[in-house]
Amino acid sequence: MNANIFSAPIFKKPTGTHLLILLTGLLFLLVVFFQSTNSLLIPLMATTLISAGLGCQVVPMLRRLKMGQIMREDGPQAHLKKAGTPTMGGSFFVPVALIFALIWSKFTPNVVAVALLTFVYMGIGWLDDWQILRYKSNKGLSPQMKLILQITGAVLFCLWMLVNQVSTDITLWGRLVIPLGFFFWILAGFVLVAESNATNLTDGVDGLAGGTGAIAFLGLGIIIAPSHPDLAIFCTCFAGACLGFIFHNRNPAKVFMGDTGSLALGGALAAVGLIAGHLWGLFLISGLFFLESLSVIAQVIYYKATKGPDGKGKRLLKMAPFHHHLELSGWTETKIVGAFYLVNALLVVLAIWSS
């Protein structure tokens, strides 16, 4: 192969459309190679088309309602030009995923429970987005209030799992099963809150959270399909809805998902992983989300640890989360997103092979 092919613009500076094609191809290949019956292909395609089509109606409406994003002044300066881009895009693609997942799965108890948890987390995100738009600031709900609401949702979901006698065993690499007993509930609450915050932190570059979310959902769906076909349908509908959203969110984005979408993504992923007993697969698939979270935690700890008499500390990264560090290191947004898509697809393949 001619090495000069990699000097082509599609590799050096991909466009948002290039990334949409890449994402579509990755999702299609995952279904074809790892899902023997291809039963997930139809719900994937259907929700993609419906989500993309609905967005054509909702995005202009959000613009007319002046639902423009308020940008962080302490964020990358290049992002200030995005101020005014409609937000709360999660309000159209998340309901598409939930409605079609419920119908396609025939309202099984597991899917109903996960859908309700997802709706609750979407509601928390909506409140946060609405506060930001209402007061024209980027503060939204206080971190304490948001955490309290997330924990409340997690506790209610754990109570449902307890009543319905969901297994407290977790399966690790090599099909090693570990019974956690009471400690499972502590882990479950943590996973629900941590995963939703991790996807929220990942939502900082056009097409990043939605695309990596689509790959993660489809990968988790493929893993659990043999044991939980109803939840596999849920995951596939979410993957398709995310892909349809990327049609509008690809660089340059016409709409952002906001916390309305990002909190729902993480909550849904965590809930499915917990019910299906595949936390190891969830951990691998969510590797990039956790990297984003850990980069923020490490940045804060390092800054406080190196704080001098003047009250100022040193920064481990140029900016957290990690994708902002890459931006300030000279990476274009599209290059970051393309790299994250490919790495996430590899993590999904690893999770499938090890499950």
Curated annotation (Swiss-Prot):
Subcellular location: Cell inner membrane
Membrane topology of this protein: Multi-pass membrane protein
Enzyme Commission (EC) number: 2.7.8.13
Required cofactor names: Mg(2+)
Transmembrane regions: 14-34, 40-60, 84-104, 107-127, 147-167, 176-196, 205-225, 227-247, 268-290, 334-354
Primary site of residence: membrane
InterPro entries: Glycosyl_transferase_4, PNAcMuramoyl-5peptid_Trfase, PNAcMuramoyl-5peptid_Trfase_CS
GO terms under cellular component: plasma membrane
Root EC class: transferase
A GO molecular-function annotation: phospho-N-acetylmuramoyl-pentapeptide-transferase activity
Catalytic activity entry: UDP-N-acetyl-alpha-D-muramoyl-L-alanyl-gamma-D-glutamyl-meso-2,6-diaminopimeloyl-D-alanyl-D-alanine + di-trans,octa-cis-undecaprenyl phosphate = di-trans,octa-cis-undecaprenyl diphospho-N-acetyl-alpha-D-muramoyl-L-alanyl-D-glutamyl-meso-2,6-diaminopimeloyl-D-alanyl-D-alanine + UMP
One GO process term, biological-process aspect: regulation of cell shape
Keywords, comma-separated and alphabetical: Cell cycle, Cell division, Cell inner membrane, Cell membrane, Cell shape, Cell wall biogenesis/degradation, Magnesium, Membrane, Metal-binding, Peptidoglycan synthesis, Transferase, Transmembrane, Transmembrane helix
Pathway given in the UniProt record: Cell wall biogenesis; peptidoglycan biosynthesis
Keyword Membrane: yes
Function noted in UniProt: Catalyzes the initial step of the lipid cycle reactions in the biosynthesis of the cell wall peptidoglycan: transfers peptidoglycan precursor phospho-MurNAc-pentapeptide from UDP-MurNAc-pentapeptide onto the lipid carrier undecaprenyl phosphate, yielding undecaprenyl-pyrophosphoryl-MurNAc-pentapeptide, known as lipid I.
Family named by the database record: Belongs to the glycosyltransferase 4 family. MraY subfamily.
Name of this chain's protein: Phospho-N-acetylmuramoyl-pentapeptide-transferase
Originating organism: Microcystis aeruginosa (strain NIES-843 / IAM M-2473)
Phylogenetic lineage: Bacteria, Bacillati, Cyanobacteriota, Cyanophyceae, Oscillatoriophycideae
